[in-house]
Amino acid sequence: MLPYPQIDPVAIALGPLKIHWYGLMYLVGIGGAWWLASRRLARFDASWSKEKLSDLVFWVAMGVILGGRLGYVFFYDFAAYIAEPAKILRVWEGGMSFHGGLIGVMLATWWFGKRNGKSFFELMDFIAPLVPIGLGAGRIGNFINAELWGKATDVPWAMVFPTDPEQLARHPSQLYQFALEGVALFTILWFYSRKPRPTMAVSGMFAACYGVFRFIVEFVRVPDAQLGYLAWGWLTMGQILCLPMILGGIGLIAYAYKRQPVQGAA
């Protein structure tokens, strides 16, 4: 068993003002995505300025935050938030959904594309390789917060999390997700998007790979207490939400290569 590193979730405390590592991870993800996007901008559209790119990143970030919060409300704990709607605004208490954030990003991308003469999938293909930076940073934030841990296990790398009332050795599922959704997904999309691909293919690859990775990790991750398993003693809400991503991603890739020749890389 490995010892859990006791990291204070509060990174900086200035009197009553407390800045948490989880919030800083959002900044790392957004900043890293902007930096990488700026390096790829000329290949995407040489006429775009850094200011326009910053606008895109801003609206995508808003989509992540608003969509992530509302997605958690609707997908994971709807009854509790309907009973007390003011809880929706108490974001410091936790509760963000990747799938809600993805919907928020898609809406923000569609809106931004309409205003700037770009199709939805042109922008999504450009954005997709940037997303794993934020995903990886977010999972590190989950690990520091000692939340979203895995099932009890006797593997050599199991950890006892301080927030676990049972104090059992568990899978560090946050680190599994960091490795898969962050490192592996970034590597796949980075190399896949370096070569010319038809529009929609990069978006499809992102959706399919993320869906598969998340579906796998859900087998060792403890489901949200208020939901538990939804069917057959193992199916979680996360897995249900990943199924359309996997099927839709595969469908997008197949359709992309069928409908058009390869164009410039995103």
From Swiss-Prot:
<keyword id="KW-1133">Transmembrane helix</keyword>
<keyword id="KW-1003">Cell membrane</keyword>
<feature type="transmembrane region" description="Helical">
    <location>
        <begin position="200"/>
        <end position="220"/>
    </location>
</feature>
<keyword id="KW-0808">Transferase</keyword>
<keyword id="KW-0472">Membrane</keyword>
<feature type="transmembrane region" description="Helical">
    <location>
        <begin position="92"/>
        <end position="112"/>
    </location>
</feature>
<feature type="transmembrane region" description="Helical">
    <location>
        <begin position="120"/>
        <end position="140"/>
    </location>
</feature>
<dbReference type="InterPro" id="IPR001640">
    <property type="entry name" value="Lgt"/>
</dbReference>
<feature type="transmembrane region" description="Helical">
    <location>
        <begin position="56"/>
        <end position="76"/>
    </location>
</feature>
<keyword id="KW-0812">Transmembrane</keyword>
<dbReference type="GO" id="GO:0005886">
    <property type="term" value="C:plasma membrane"/>
</dbReference>
<feature type="transmembrane region" description="Helical">
    <location>
        <begin position="172"/>
        <end position="192"/>
    </location>
</feature>
<feature type="transmembrane region" description="Helical">
    <location>
        <begin position="234"/>
        <end position="254"/>
    </location>
</feature>
<comment type="similarity">
    <text>Belongs to the Lgt family.</text>
</comment>
<dbReference type="GO" id="GO:0042158">
    <property type="term" value="P:lipoprotein biosynthetic process"/>
</dbReference>
<comment type="pathway">
    <text>Protein modification; lipoprotein biosynthesis (diacylglyceryl transfer).</text>
</comment>
<protein>
    <recommendedName>
        <fullName>Phosphatidylglycerol--prolipoprotein diacylglyceryl transferase</fullName>
        <ecNumber>2.5.1.145</ecNumber>
    </recommendedName>
</protein>
<feature type="binding site">
    <location>
        <position position="139"/>
    </location>
    <ligand>
        <name>a 1,2-diacyl-sn-glycero-3-phospho-(1'-sn-glycerol)</name>
    </ligand>
</feature>
<dbReference type="Pfam" id="PF01790">
    <property type="entry name" value="LGT"/>
</dbReference>
<dbReference type="GO" id="GO:0008961">
    <property type="term" value="F:phosphatidylglycerol-prolipoprotein diacylglyceryl transferase activity"/>
</dbReference>
<comment type="function">
    <text>Catalyzes the transfer of the diacylglyceryl group from phosphatidylglycerol to the sulfhydryl group of the N-terminal cysteine of a prolipoprotein, the first step in the formation of mature lipoproteins.</text>
</comment>
<feature type="transmembrane region" description="Helical">
    <location>
        <begin position="10"/>
        <end position="30"/>
    </location>
</feature>
<keyword id="KW-0997">Cell inner membrane</keyword>
